Amino acid sequence: MCLPGISGLSQKEEIKIMGKYFGTDGFRGEANVNLTVEHAYKVGRFLGWYYGQRAKKTADNPEGRCRVAIGKDTRRSSYMFEYSLVAGLTASGADVYLLHVTTTPSVSYVVRTEEFDCGIMISASHNPYYDNGIKVINGKGEKLEEDVIVEIERYLDGEMEEIPFALKDAIGRTTDYAAGRNRYIGYLISIATRSFKGKKVALDCANGSASAIAKNVFDALGAETHVINNHPNGLNINTDCGSTHIHVLQEYVKESGCDVGFAYDGDADRCIAVDENGSVVDGDLILYICGKYMKETGTLRNNTVVTTIMSNFGLYKAFDREGISYEKTAVGDKYVYENMSQYGNCLGGEQSGHIIFSKHATTGDGILTSLKVMEVMLEKKETLGKLASEVEILPQVLKNVRVKDKKEAQDDPAVQAEVAKVTETLGADGRILLRQSGTEPVVRVMVEAPTTEQCEMLVDQVIEVMKAHGHVL
């Protein structure tokens, strides 16, 4: 359905922050500060016990032995968290399969296509190297259910009875399972509908998980592959590279004369593209390009694309012009996927580059998104710049404001009064949105307006009010 107006959901409706430890994308924090090896061990203990209890209820597994796949990104701390999780899981009787350095979507793929009870990805996605996170994936390859997260948090806070240890031969086993990652690479290659021969493609792997996978895929499909930022050292993940520092890829594409470029984040669940001229093609534009193509080929289920409230107003105008319906959800690919599952929609995503193709995946997948963009370019025999030019993007400025307390900062009457003032100023020509980050002590202030200068001015007005009332760190 097409939602009226350009403000989408109300601010209260869009804020979905889970609990004390788990945010919109798992348990994330600075390593050894607010995410510790003790936390990881206890998460492992709980998951091994929880899925073991579920397994006991099945006729073919009376011993309650569950199977858990673990992947990690390239941060130095990922290894210590992996060891802690393995210790907790096996102490509770779970068998653990190590995928090693791999992407979040690969863990999801392995779990949902094999007999795993759950999967864990150790990553803080686009965050700096000193942060890390624990993402838990259920047996269907989806983000973990919120009721289970509540129980994990209760255990972390000591509100549950102590979990018994597995003894003797009930102690879990640990297995090297790099073969699972390799099977995922083969799956990605099988999705491509055409050879990429003759195409010069640049990949920015963010010195992260994509470094282990992306080049293999594009080389196998015949592309002339140029890879940058694929030498991780544990400390350089996302540092001046990848999807959050897209200018690096823009310059490289222009200098090297590539036909297209793709930038990933630390765990490669998102993708931002760069066209042949070095212009950015973000998640909104990718949704339009793929959505229009899927409508033309009769593969856009329900004739609907699922977006979030952060998507640009220009995207909705383009969808309206093409007769494509859309849904708006809270920010987070978790909520995009929930909508897709509930209503049977097959394409959804975020401006940040989390794109979900439900025919192939249950979570955002940066490398898969690259393949789908290549498919449209090849099938339509068009450059990416030409495909993206059909959308007139409204200027948008978003600033992340680090604050002492997210809720207090956003709900402050003075801040809300300033938001109302900006809303009145913009009228029907734009919008303002305040949103609390689900993973950081940050309030995001976003304005869309006729000019970038006006966006900057209005965003800064709101931030100044936050500063004046003592909210900003």
Which residues does each PLM region occupy?
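Short glycine-centered, acidic/aromatic-flanked micro-motifs in structured strand/loop junctions
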Residues: G71-K72, L203-C205, D275, K359, ...
